[in-house]
Regions:
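Conserved catalytic core of sirtuin-type NAD+-dependent deacylases
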Residues: 1-217
Length: 217
């Protein structure tokens, strides 16, 4: 088993050394410590973190979503995040596409980061787009009679929503377009810590393959 692992590591090192345009894709659990990842990532969050629940049972949505969003925002950068950031800093990796919502890649120092689900670090007004930190949202929930945070801008008062995507919503269009462009551009596509179960991201590794690139999973 150790010999097989050593051989895989050597082959990956050779692929990286021979690549001029490497792009990495990471899954939702690279920085997770438990099953508390974002709705769009296909985890237990999908039971309540959906657009439908937000619209029909907003108090239940916020009761369940906000503690998990806070947990995700407080996660520590892992050695895997640091290693990828160092590879990007050294020019070995040129961009990172991630399904994660904890923003840990950015905190690790990744410069060219594509977050296809955005992240859970903030919420926004669904009408005027004012942005609120999670701590502010908690205060608004505590002060609300119905447990629903609302915009504090004078004359607005519209309910807030997470900045990131929810079940039942399309992914961030600009990020998806850029992810496809980078997958088509690269000559080596690394797939890390994702089971490739959710479309359209599950189809992304096929893009470089069709253009003669290599994929390492």
């Amino acid at each position: 088993m150790a010999d097989d692992l050593d051989g895989d590591i050597r082959r990956l090192a050779d692929l990286l050394a021979g690549s001029e345009r490497c792009v990495a894709m990471t899954g939702v659990r690279l920085g997770a410590t438990e099953d508390t990842e974002a709705a769009a990532a296909g985890s237990a969050w999908g039971e309540f973190a959906s657009l439908e629940v937000l619209l029909t049972e907003p108090a239940r949505f916020w009761e369940n979503w906000l503690p998990r969003a806070i947990e995700a925002s407080e996660r520590e950068v892992t050695p895997a995040h640091r290693a990828l950031a160092r590879l990007e800093g050294a020019g070995v990796i040129h961009a990172i596409i991630t399904q994660a919502v904890d923003h840990l890649h950015a905190r690790a120092g990744d410069g060219d980061l594509i977050e296809v689900h955005a992240n859970v670090l903030s919420c926004r007004c669904a009408r005027c787009d004012d942005v609120y930190a999670l701590s502010e949202v908690q205060g608004l929930i505590d002060a609300a009679d119905d447990g629903v945070p609302r915009c504090t801008r004078e004359g607005c008062g519209y309910p807030l929503r997470p900045t990131g995507t929810l079940w039942g919503e399309p992914l961030v269009e600009e990020a998806i377009i850029r992810a496809w462009d980078m997958a088509a551009w690269c000559d080596l596509f690394l797939v890390l810590d994702t089971q490739l179960r959710t479309d359209p991201m599950a189809m992304l590794p096929s893009v470089p393959l069709k253009r003669g690139g290599k994929v390492a999973i």
